[in-house]
Amino acid sequence: MELMSSLGSLLASSLPIEKKQHALVELVLHTYQPQQRTALFKTVTEYRRNQLELLFPEHQAKSDSVMFEVMDYRDLIQRYPNTLSTEVALLEEAVGQCYIHWLDFWCECEISAIKAKLPLSTHALYPMDLPIKDSAYYGVIIDQIENSQLIVQTPTRPQGLPISDAIALSNLEVFIKGEKWYEMLPLLHLSQTGKHFILLKHPTDEAFPTLVSSALIQDWSKYETWLSYAPPFCNDKWKYSLSRRGYEGLAELHIFTPPALSKCDSIPEFDNKFQLQLAEMQAVCEILRLTVSGNIQQKVYFLYLAQKEMLNLLHQAGYKIGFTIIDQPLILDFYKAIEPQAYLPLGYCDLNETNLLTYRGLWNIELMLKAFNHVNFRDYRRCLRENKNTAWQII
């Protein structure tokens, strides 16, 4: 009843939109416990997604970012009021006043929930020095991030955060809010658990190391939940592209029984044969959610250094193959320029029919590491600067 009253007052108020947004987020965070909040967001997301698929069946295979923007959210909730409960219907009405759609609101709530654990003090707002200097940084792979006692700061949050919260916040700000990868919201726990690579700046005058890059590493023991094997990334819409030399490169790794994969005609067929013939399970992983922080030039540098550091650590740990999903062709062009056989392209697909391709492929970790060890950041930057596929202003 208190929530209903507060929502009614908020809807009737003439507060500026920014203050309304803040008040609505605070109301939800104070009303629902974390598990209740997650259940609420998942339930309404599924309810509206199913509804939108019925209304626009031609878009039902597309991403959440596309589905939730095919119809104005305020029009949607007015024409099709929520039938889950009166409380949820009123909440959606308030969300419609303040946010683009439900998933945009969910993202903001999760960001605020993490930031609320340690409010940002005014004296902490100072420019952070992130030098373009390899020796200023170091990489680490942490097996169970949820059990780590490591405290870090981030370029946008110069106060100590548990590493699991720092990674989740980075994923929220970079991928979900920045790239609109809303499918990550119900899987946010993956940012706070399991195996992760992190790139840290050595503390100088700061109290904590600074997190500038992270990536999720999933071992073969979890392959059933890999993104690579999720339906949108493993179907016949994908154009299969593994070359004859790619098959030879896989055979040379000696991870299959029998040692060579027979030629495949599709991504699903390749995935099936790979799973059936894989004998050296500990040599294979999936690498996802590679985030980098900073301004454009810093991001370019951290993308280079994070890959180099991570490859070194993966190789030391005995990994031979890393599954990847990449949506930036400039990265693939760089791989091809430094060592054509280090990256094995499996296929590509225009997932949302927007003329933007997503690529599935494999890192040959040993070859990729050797290639990175023979280039420096100047080479990397020159390659990107000359690349017609990049929208980044590389100087």
UniProtKB/Swiss-Prot annotation:
It holds the Pfam family AHL_synthase. It catalyses: a fatty acyl-[ACP] + S-adenosyl-L-methionine = an N-acyl-L-homoserine lactone + S-methyl-5'-thioadenosine + holo-[ACP] + H(+). It comes from the Bacteria. This is Acyl-homoserine-lactone synthase LuxM. InterPro entries: AHL_synthase (IPR035304). The keyword S-adenosyl-L-methionine applies. The gene is luxM. Belongs to the LuxM / VanM family. Keywords: Autoinducer synthesis, Quorum sensing, S-adenosyl-L-methionine, Transferase. The keyword Transferase applies. Its EC number is 2.3.1.184. GO terms for biological process: quorum sensing. One of its GO terms (molecular function) is N-acyl homoserine lactone synthase activity. It comes from Vibrio atlanticus (strain LGP32).
